[in-house]
A protein has these predicted regions:
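Positively charged, solvent-exposed patches that mediate nucleic-acid binding
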Residues: 1, 24, 37, 46-47, ...
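Residue-level signal for inorganic ion chemistry
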Residues: 22, 79, 99
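Hydrophobic "anchor" residues on beta-strands that sit immediately upstream
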Residues: 28, 51, 96
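Short acidic/glycine-enriched loop/turn segments that link adjacent beta-strands
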Residues: 36-39, 107
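Conserved catalytic cores of phosphodiester-cleaving nucleases, focusing on short active-site segments
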Residues: 41-67, 71, 79
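A short, N-terminal amphipathic alpha-helix
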Residues: 81-88
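Domain-level recognition of nuclease-like catalytic cores that cleave nucleotide substrates
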Residues: 89-116
């Protein structure tokens, strides 16, 4: 399981903006676009013993709903499973895992910590 550069140009720009937000707030970017055959985690960040699994949603308009609305219950379940696989593979010494959603829209980044 290796990171890869997938997704659209807009999605990559959103991931760059979200990464910058986490760096500005004292996090280390551990991995971007970590993937396995069952899916991908956009961002994995660390601050101390806290590991953050972040889903990044980028929108240019609200025409199809807010970025936060795009993270469905099915997507949340899939991210939990992916996080488990990541933890089993990497065996980090993390005591706490948190799931965030980063919404990137109109040049701004809003992070919902502990989104689920």
């Amino acid at each position: 399981m290796v990171p890869h550069a997938g997704g659209s140009a807009l999605g990559r720009l959103g991931e760059e903006a979200a990464s910058a937000w986490y760096l500005q707030h004292g996090y280390e970017i551990v991995q971007r676009n970590w993937s396995c055959r069952t899916g991908e985690i956009d961002l994995i960040c660390r601050r101390g013993q806290l590991l953050v699994i972040c889903e990044v949603k980028t929108r240019t308009t609200d025409q199809f709903g807010s970025p936060f609305e795009a993270v469905t219950s099915a997507k949340r379940r899939r991210l939990r499973r992916l996080a488990t696989l990541y933890l089993l593979e990497t065996a980090p010494t993390t005591t706490v895992v948190r799931f965030d959603v980063a919404a990137v829209q109109g040049g701004s980044v809003e992070v919902l910590e502990n989104a689920f």
